[in-house]
Amino acid sequence: MQKIMDSAVAGLGGYSNGGYAVAINPHTGGIYGMAGVYRDPNTGKTTVDPAGAINQSITMGSVVKPAMIIGALKSGVITPDNNVLTDMPIKVKDTPVKGSWFNKSGGANVALTASDALMVSSNSYMMQLAMKEAGFKYSYGATLTMPTSIFKKLRNNFNEFGLGVRTGIDLPGEVSGLEGKSTAKYIGSALDLSYGNYDSYTTIQLAQYASILANKGYKIQPHLLQSIRANGKDGKMGAVKYEVKPNITGVIDVPDSYWDIIHSGMYKVVHGTSQYATGTAMKDINPAIAAKTGTAETVYKNTDTITLSAISYAPYDDPQVVVVVAFPNLASDKSSINMNTLKSIYEAYWKDVQSSDGYKTSK
């Protein structure tokens, strides 16, 4: 896995900081692989940096959207049977127009279910959810009068999914991420928070979060240690003296109908027929995966960059493994590195860790 990340980062230039990846068992928290490369954007020099997966805070982008939808369902602003909103550019007073990547000007306004909003990665849908959760009735050009408590409400929901809080991994140096400012002056940034373009998280947090999505609600502590064995008399490993057991640190207890929306949407990200489905470059991965891609608009030294990420699990209908990746501060011409890297990691997983026999066909 480290070789895969080395190869991926080797082709990067500009202000790229490198990249990070984690593969994890969504049912036990056991880490199959954790890899990373730090790239000095000033010199281009790279350093092997797997610990960056737990101590580098990155603005991850749209990968947060499944959590945003679950939060909105829990709040009751949408329901499993009533969740259609129109994707349209959002304009509030004294703030530039914010919109979805495929509908910046309003020429592609379209009604979306929550599941389809994931498929096409609708920023507009998430902003509308945030405004609904804040009790703000939106109209074009209106003054955004949301209370600052919306920051806490959105963050509390993300925290339940492991975003913005330490996972408790059995390594020193883990950080919780970074929060943007939350005063009334920055209330417009609550809209950015709703689609992942404000706060920063770590790659290990993405792994725990994606595991929660895969296992339908169980927040499990990630761990590298699997077991401790005694020394055998012949120099070989002896009996198991201690074995790490899954440590469930929280449960998101919601109806299966909520998870069905998320799983359907993440499947359609990869296998959907919409021209705007964001992950179809991964449709040939076998066994089939479900995923959510992420793109954050970032800035480095006054230069616009993008940060690409992805969360995924496979097989989509019986998750055995979660794979997540993050590549901060890229030039826009590297727009598929997140998906290409996922492909390579899955190929290695099914070859070296677990046989894909029995998972070749979908249910």
What are these regions (language model features)?
Residues 1-12, 362-363:
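N-terminal leader/targeting segments and the immediately adjacent pre-domain N-terminus
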Residues 328-341:
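A short acidic/glycine-rich loop-to-helix N-cap element
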